[in-house]
């Protein structure tokens, strides 16, 4: 087992990784920018190293600084968390070249799945169902029009190197297509340095359902069920739950085994998530995330499997200790992403937390690096923490979530807690009758007023 792990991240995920390391008896190294000197993961780690000024490009994305921190501390492995360098294949290669283990997938799989066009082609070859669309990047507007007419409008123009909703535009008619192509290309170039785009059939009211996988790189891989991430705003997930209200056990087992078989074929290593749109009883592959997900605790709550701990084990060369037949699903779990933002305008609200009281009780988990007196810096993602609740049934889980949300106190900054308090009292959410466009319609209709 590794002796010392450097955690190349910040916030709640840095603390989450630190806890897994402690439970394995592994020494921890926290890295931080000057803005994060008082962060909780820095306080709790065995060692800490300042890697640069507040800007992420000068600190958390600064590969030479991270390598220096590994050398100074003698860390023999790096866990990248999510975001930042977690899906950077070159970073994984550089670490390996310097004798440091990367706790994550093989670089070739990170690179493959980071290219959305190649990822879709590979998924299709592996037997994973995909959304009808172009076979590769669009070469001209004329080609795009021909493909769009073939698959039928509306269509979605997507950046090949995209993610997080950037470089995505809908064209409802042939007349809309040139503008959608031009806008998506411009956004893709600005965000990813690559203006390649491709076309997919636009699904009007799908759910966003993802399958959690875990592989050991030796040909063993399992699935850990699904998460329903359909409550989204601007393609950003807000609330996740498992199991999905839309799936039954046979549908879950079928798509899960398709995905797990595909991961066995490529000898996938570490945790990963295969994401689908789901409509009219059919799954359509959209992408694969080759990292731990923000919403991984939902899966941990219903399977009692520590995903971060398993990431560390298999990165050290261990075979999976869990067979598919050993995976059991218990009850229901829901996660709310609590952001330091205005709940209506979603403007970030950095500042000092004056009062902080996270909820507790049976079946309640809070993954957060916040504490009373903590000053939320303005330089990074506004995620304050995650409230995860488990119950024997979905109904019990929702009642427990209502109670936990009402108990949660954060003063000094604005948060999205009021949004979640409204959502868990809405009939559609209570019935599980929502899709990926539902939340934006709810907000537009004044579902939550400032």
Task: Say what each PLM segment does.
Residues 7-26, 48, 71-73, 89, ...:
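ATP-dependent carboxylate activation and anion-phosphoryl transfer catalytic cores
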Residues 147-156:
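Acidic/histidine-enriched active-site and ligand-binding environments that engage anionic O-linkages
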